[in-house]
Design a protein with these regions (language model features):
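Bacterial Sec-dependent N-terminal signal peptides
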Residues: 1-29
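Glycine/tyrosine- and acidic-biased, solvent-exposed loop/turn segments at the edges of beta-strands
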Residues: 20-246
């Protein structure tokens, strides 16, 4: 056998070997073990052949990092889940299509637990929530983009229960109300942007109840006086509400 012939067979063998490797590796994708449970690397695709998700299973359980993609793009995953090897929990991050973090928190069997945080497009903190078994629990905090607190609301069993406060973007309290099972119930107070009390009264099961007090510049006024005062625009001209639909 000539040197040229030997070289031909060697190159042919090497080429076949490397050509075989991807095919061999491909066979290990989307496999089941002897117990008919998913094992190893799994990849799923949308009907347009874009990747839907990629991750790894061990005896049917997700482990490590799973990446989920939107049907419109494969540039950046819209969800990344970091699964624990020793429990059913996963650290979950949601992203915009261009890769900006939207929210993050922990899930256990697809239910939110513990602290979850949400973000403005510029990365600033927008909201903080706490969950127990998939339901809101404890104090929710929403923020303005300048970092000031916008809202503080107490939740129990997934519903508003207890005090709820709202603030201006300068930190001034403008609303303080109470809830019972998602309905306004109890004392209610509303304030001007100056911080002066504007009106106060009581709610019963979502409706105003009894006598409400009204204030202008900290001075108590009648409901009629309050209504007349609200007809004035900032420049002092009267404004008929009936003309607002023009």
């Amino acid at each position: 056998m000539t040197t040229a012939t030997r070289l031909f067979f060697v190159l042919t063998f090497v080429g076949c070997f490397f050509a075989y490797q991807p095919a061999k590796a491909q066979k290990k994708i989307n496999q089941f073990n002897e117990n008919k449970k998913r094992t190893g690397v799994w990849k799923k695709y949308y009907s347009n052949q874009r990747i839907r998700y990629v991750g790894q299973f061990v005896n049917g359980k997700e482990v490590g990092t799973f990446k989920y993609y939107d049907i419109s793009t494969s540039k950046h995953p819209v969800i990344i889940k970091e699964f624990s090897a020793s429990s059913d929990s996963a650290l979950v991050r949601y992203y915009t299509l261009d890769g900006q973090l939207r929210s993050k928190g922990t899930m256990v069997q697809r239910k939110r637990v513990g602290k979850w945080t949400y973000y403005f497009p510029n990365g600033q903190l927008f909201s903080e929530e706490f969950y127990v078994d998939g339901q809101l629990e404890g104090e929710l905090k929403n923020y303005y983009i300048n970092g000031q607190v916008l809202e503080l609301t107490t939740y129990q069993n997934g519903m508003k229960n207890g005090v709820s406060k709202k603030f201006s973007d300068e930190g001034i309290l403008i609303e303080e109300v109470y809830y019972l099972d998602d309905k306004l119930h109890g004392k209610g107070k509303y304030f001007e942007l100056s911080g002066d009390l504007k009106e106060e009264g009581e709610y019963r099961y979502g409706k105003r109840y009894g006598k409400w007090e009204f204030y202008i510049g900290g001075k108590k006024v009648t409901k009629k006086e309050m209504k007349n005062a609200t007809k004035y625009s900032k420049n002092g001209d009267t404004k008929d509400q009936e003309d607002d639909n023009d």
